[in-house]
Amino acid sequence: NNRNGIAITWNKIEGATGYYIYRDGKKICQVKKETTKYTDKGANKNGTLYGFSIMAYKTINGKTYKSVISPGVKSCFLKGSSIDILTKKAGNTHVSWRKNSKANGYQVQYSTKQSFKKARVKTVKGQNKKSAKLSKLKNTKSYYVRLRGYVRKGKKKYYSHWSTCAKIIPWNGKWEFAGYSKIHTDSAVLYFSSASKVKNKTVCINAGHGTKGGESVKTLCHPDGSAKVTGGSTAQGAIRATSINGGTTLNDGTPEAKATLNLAMIVKQKLLKAGYNVLMVREDEDAQIDNIGRTVYANNCADYHIALHYDSTSSNKGAFYIGVPDNQSYKNMYPVSKNWKKHNKLGKNLVWGMENAGVKIYGKGEMAIDLTQTSYSTIPSVDLEVGDKSSNHSNKALKTIASGIVKGMNK
């Protein structure tokens, strides 16, 4: 099995002009002698068993001579599954996937090497299974994870192709600014795109808030210990801020953290489909990584950092990005000094993309605030306020916002 159908290979026959390929007794293809492999893209019905055979032929003076047909070989096409969510929290690692209705079970493979050398394998039996707990993963090591489904036909087991892998990335205390983070016991996860044209760029998607206990811990607003130059969730002049706050509550009672997570999961899938790799720093209700921790992860494992939020107003004013304040002392502070123009450019592109996708934009699409995120960012980084407490956050609305974010990234 591969993504497009069933791949067939055979031994080369010396002197042959070419080969005929048969599926279920019917000739489907004629290939030339240089080829000893072929992918039957027509053998792509999920859960269907196909039979294949090969016949060599030789053409001499316009006349074709055929060999006897090879013994038949059977193979079942099984559509591949993909990893949906992978989390590693306080020693517990869980993986979930989108189930295949024709699969009888799944294999999950995980290894410290991307080649999956010396990999561990967990077999999950059951047609309706779509998650598994992985064991014996060390907290200080990175792990690559992939999966495939299987189906039984008689006494034989057939497998789908392997999914694109995801990588668990543990916290590294040697990273720049790592010492400023107070909460970082969970791991981030890097998802690799399986698009036909990958962009070789990684976007960190940060679903704002969602860290239990974060409000009881304080961190420095700036890495140099200076005071905030504007107000915001933390007052102007403050030296320390909440490591990560709980967020607001939308007018229908939905916690902001839940709304941003719903959006983040949609953005993740759309970016992967568009060819971007995606770093996720929160994929569930509680991710034990604070604002500085999420920023440090993005700095070291991504090319761009987009944090998703809803503003605390109730006027349905529209979306905007948080720009860098026009304060010279702040702009001169490292790492802001090297990146503030990149932050603002990313924000403008994202607002442009959302506006072109049909998202309501607030004013000129920018509000300047001194944020912890941009104060520690060494890559293009932006807080994107996608609406406020009165904004529509239905699945349809979130898909529109996500499409706009992809448009902005592609600009």
Residue spans for each PLM region:
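Pro/Thr/Ser/Gly-rich low-complexity, intrinsically disordered linker/stalk tracts
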Residues: 1-15, 46, 62-102, 139, ...
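Short, surface-exposed beta-strand/beta-hairpin micro-motifs centered on an aromatic residue
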Residues: 7, 35-39, 94, 129-133
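Conserved hydrophobic/aromatic "anchor" residues
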Residues: 10, 19, 50-52, 57, ...
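Extracellular low-complexity, O-glycosylation-prone stalks/linkers
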Residues: 13-28, 102-123
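Short coil/turn motifs at secondary-structure junctions
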Residues: 15, 26, 59, 102, ...
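Short beta-strand segments within Ig-like beta-sandwich modules, predominantly Fibronectin type-III
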Residues: 28-35, 122-128
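Beta-strand-rich modules
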Residues: 38-65, 134-157
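Catalytic-site microenvironment of enzymes
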Residues: 90, 169-411
